């Protein structure tokens, strides 16, 4: 392997780019790990994160078969062992375009994590590592260009650890190894103090790590006990900006000149405002892996955390050994108490979504209380879990357990991990506290009393309004139903009580025979008759005494009285007598002849429906206005030419009147001029003659007429389009005409698109 000094330029700062992260294909472990493009790092980062959520790797997938034997050998020979120390020399090409078969088992996005997470093994069965332990990791490189931060460092206690491949300020290295001093040339002697200065970590992180390492001396299983130090730096961006400015300033300074300007005068320093040296500005995170400046990690920290636990803890967890838990009142085994957590999860997923969300909120509150009790600095000392389960531990449950507890121990982490990894894997949108609605549900302040009271009052008012409207509609419908029944079955007055037992018996028999007569009489009625307001029908027999005026009509008398149920009517004399006999009851007559008869006792004539013809020559009743020579000179009357013979609406004569154009009505017997500008001609033709201005024809007549036997002879017409009875003549003073029917036909006789028919 090329020494570190060979890749350090004398004019540049020793910090180089971060290691490239593998794409989604390299994560599958079946292909070789190739360097990614620096322009789509964010997209591939999201793909890796989604892939890790849906299908996280585990030792059961046989992807780490070549790695576990080597790591176990190093674990047995060292009490403080890092995963990077057990790496074989075959991983030298990770990050380059040409890699060997051994390096394809690992994706290079896991390499920076190997030095950020430390594991502790039992000190009773292990000894201190020898200096030759780090010799294999000395030749290990995570980038195509050797980085100074990747060099292994020796602490004062003799333990070896590898600093993060990411150029961060809180690295875990303390000093350069003495074994590599002979490789540093005289030309790079001035760069060596800078490298040593950058590798020195803050004191509080070292104390925290030492304190935590001392508390885990008696653990039987490795644990992920601390998050990488650059997570704190990720939360504090100002520190990163200051370091970025310091790095830029050191790179731009001439060779042999320090950052503090010691031993040089102020004249030798380039002024900040000069064009040769521009003031460096803090920038956002750099997603590129080829930049020369300070580079931030481009992979989410959760990926590193989960991958670290998989590499260190799954083998011992599957073997059934006791697992140390930072939470003393919990156990990693309690997630496998019931087998339904694995087999019956899909059946209870929908019904337990709210419970899982509530449980996540309780977990957040409990972690907050534990952190506040411990002053938010150090976690509580771990305790060993109870005896192992009869069957092996579920890797997913142990994985979720350790991930959640490790996240809770990091006081700088924004939000803890969900406790159930199966919910996160199957339904990350609803059950995950990081991505779903749990964070918005459990972390919002509770509404005030005024808001709750206002909301409840508004909801109650809306409910009352809806209930009130429902009651009003029900009352209105019942009123309409009773009004319809009043025409068919009028209530008998209390004064008309039967005077003898025989009459009461006859009334009872009439009520019993009423449904029979109704079912027997329906067969004689045409299909066009509606089923409303109809009770019983009786067809008159064919006799020779019928009048010739009624030969073309079919008259049917319907009576609701008890005395006229079985009686048959024949001829106009019988009809008049029937009406007189049924004066105390309500009855009507249905006829197919569309003729409006005059009221009884009035001298009016019968009014027939206009002749349904499409020829104007048959409809017109006059030959036009009479025009003399003097009137022709004053008012010019024009005769409209080239009209269709079936057009009954267009006037045949027009003139220029005082209020605009006027048209002559050819259907009136005497004829008359009507203003076309003020729609007089339109209303006259539609409502007096029944001619539509759209179809230029007559409206369709009613199918049948229903004449009630009352004082005003109320007449209804059956519409063929809506199949309803339309009042035509009603009221004692109303003129008997078809104007009401024409108004209904103008609105009703249309197709589905609204066109008149």
Curated annotation (Swiss-Prot):
<dbReference type="GO" id="GO:0008270">
    <property type="term" value="F:zinc ion binding"/>
</dbReference>
<feature type="region of interest" description="Disordered">
    <location>
        <begin position="181"/>
        <end position="218"/>
    </location>
</feature>
<comment type="function">
    <text>Transcription factor; part of the gene cluster that mediates the biosynthesis of the glycolipid biosurfactant ustilagic acid (UA). UA is a secreted cellobiose glycolipid that is toxic for many microorganisms and confers biocontrol activity to U.maydis. Recognizes and binds to the specific 5'-T/G-G/T-C-G-C-A-T-A/T-C/T-C/T-G/A-3' upstream activating sequence found in all promoters of the UA biosynthesis genes.</text>
</comment>
<feature type="compositionally biased region" description="Low complexity">
    <location>
        <begin position="454"/>
        <end position="465"/>
    </location>
</feature>
<feature type="compositionally biased region" description="Low complexity">
    <location>
        <begin position="494"/>
        <end position="510"/>
    </location>
</feature>
<feature type="compositionally biased region" description="Low complexity">
    <location>
        <begin position="125"/>
        <end position="165"/>
    </location>
</feature>
<keyword id="KW-0804">Transcription</keyword>
<feature type="compositionally biased region" description="Pro residues">
    <location>
        <begin position="379"/>
        <end position="393"/>
    </location>
</feature>
<feature type="compositionally biased region" description="Low complexity">
    <location>
        <begin position="543"/>
        <end position="582"/>
    </location>
</feature>
<keyword id="KW-0539">Nucleus</keyword>
<feature type="region of interest" description="Disordered">
    <location>
        <begin position="237"/>
        <end position="295"/>
    </location>
</feature>
<keyword id="KW-0805">Transcription regulation</keyword>
<keyword id="KW-0862">Zinc</keyword>
<feature type="compositionally biased region" description="Polar residues">
    <location>
        <begin position="428"/>
        <end position="437"/>
    </location>
</feature>
<feature type="region of interest" description="Disordered">
    <location>
        <begin position="422"/>
        <end position="582"/>
    </location>
</feature>
<feature type="compositionally biased region" description="Basic residues">
    <location>
        <begin position="439"/>
        <end position="453"/>
    </location>
</feature>
<keyword id="KW-0479">Metal-binding</keyword>
<dbReference type="InterPro" id="IPR028012">
    <property type="entry name" value="Rua1_C"/>
</dbReference>
<feature type="compositionally biased region" description="Basic residues">
    <location>
        <begin position="240"/>
        <end position="249"/>
    </location>
</feature>
<feature type="compositionally biased region" description="Polar residues">
    <location>
        <begin position="253"/>
        <end position="277"/>
    </location>
</feature>
<feature type="compositionally biased region" description="Polar residues">
    <location>
        <begin position="181"/>
        <end position="190"/>
    </location>
</feature>
<dbReference type="GO" id="GO:0005634">
    <property type="term" value="C:nucleus"/>
</dbReference>
<feature type="region of interest" description="Disordered">
    <location>
        <begin position="122"/>
        <end position="169"/>
    </location>
</feature>
<keyword id="KW-0863">Zinc-finger</keyword>
<feature type="zinc finger region" description="C2H2-type 1 degenerate">
    <location>
        <begin position="661"/>
        <end position="692"/>
    </location>
</feature>
<protein>
    <recommendedName>
        <fullName>Transcription regulator rua1</fullName>
    </recommendedName>
</protein>
<feature type="compositionally biased region" description="Polar residues">
    <location>
        <begin position="200"/>
        <end position="218"/>
    </location>
</feature>
<dbReference type="Pfam" id="PF14616">
    <property type="entry name" value="Rua1_C"/>
</dbReference>
<feature type="zinc finger region" description="C2H2-type 2; degenerate">
    <location>
        <begin position="717"/>
        <end position="750"/>
    </location>
</feature>
<feature type="region of interest" description="Disordered">
    <location>
        <begin position="372"/>
        <end position="393"/>
    </location>
</feature>
